[in-house]
């Protein structure tokens, strides 16, 4: 499989991990282990020319409030399975493992920002700030503007810096957050965003943006409302 991928010129392997209910050992009996990162380290070490991008950063919790996860993190300093992911580079000597934060950031960034900060701190400390990739799962959560705003505003609690050795997240428009928002993924996919800015500034989306600005500006019309899937059953 990996040999065929490399022969085809593919360098990025995106793998869905985590996101299981609390009763996963019973409801996913015989298969839940594949949602953990037990198999990532060997693959990354055996195939250093490939990038392994772990979706949802392998966070286990799903379909429940983050209260228990936050309490567990503040008691132990660990986020189930995401901490295991973050330990892989140091424990196995690899630098081709990435953490994507779709859904798991959305689940906590507004109601439990300390957990969101703990997640980012864990990933940045273990994987490196340049190995954390943005994700919103917006087909499920609707317009991602509220998630973008949340990351721009999020700060690392001083308590976490002292207790866990986490670095700060930097300025709202700083290198760390801009890297997470796009530059990290651009590098992985060999996209030179900076050299393309000239062309992008004159494309169709730029024209639409200009129309909105003329009509009142993004600061006036922009909304953090989320429009996504709604279960009416």
Which residues does each predicted region cover?
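Catalytic pocket-lining loop regions of alpha/beta-barrel enzymes
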Residues: 1-134, 159-169, 173, 220-223
């Amino acid at each position: 499989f990996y040999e065929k991928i490399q022969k085809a010129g593919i360098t990025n392997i995106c793998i869905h991990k985590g996101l299981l209910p609390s009763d996963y050992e019973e409801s996913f009996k015989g298969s839940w282990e594949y949602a953990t990162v037990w198999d990532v380290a060997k693959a990354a070490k055996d195939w250093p020319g490939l990038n392994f991008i772990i979706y949802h950063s392998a966070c286990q919790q799903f379909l429940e409030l983050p209260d228990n996860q936050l309490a567990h993190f503040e008691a132990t300093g660990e986020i189930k399975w995401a901490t295991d992911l973050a330990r892989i580079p140091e424990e196995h000597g690899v630098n081709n493992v990435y953490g994507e934060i779709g859904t798991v950031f959305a689940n906590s960034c507004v109601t439990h920002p300390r957990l969101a900060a703990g997640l980012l701190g864990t990933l940045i400390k273990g994987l490196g700030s340049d190995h954390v990739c943005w994700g919103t799962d917006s087909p499920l959560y609707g317009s991602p503007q509220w998630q973008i705003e949340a990351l721009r505003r999020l700060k690392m609690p001083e308590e976490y810096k002292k207790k866990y050795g986490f670095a700060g997240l930097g300025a709202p428009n700083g290198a760390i957050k801009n890297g997470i928002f796009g530059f990290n993924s651009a590098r992985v996919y060999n996209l030179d965003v900076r050299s393309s800015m000239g062309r992008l500034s004159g494309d169709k989306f730029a024209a639409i943006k200009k129309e909105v600005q003329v009509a009142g500006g993004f600061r006036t019309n922009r909304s953090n409302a989320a429009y996504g899937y709604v279960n009416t059953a």
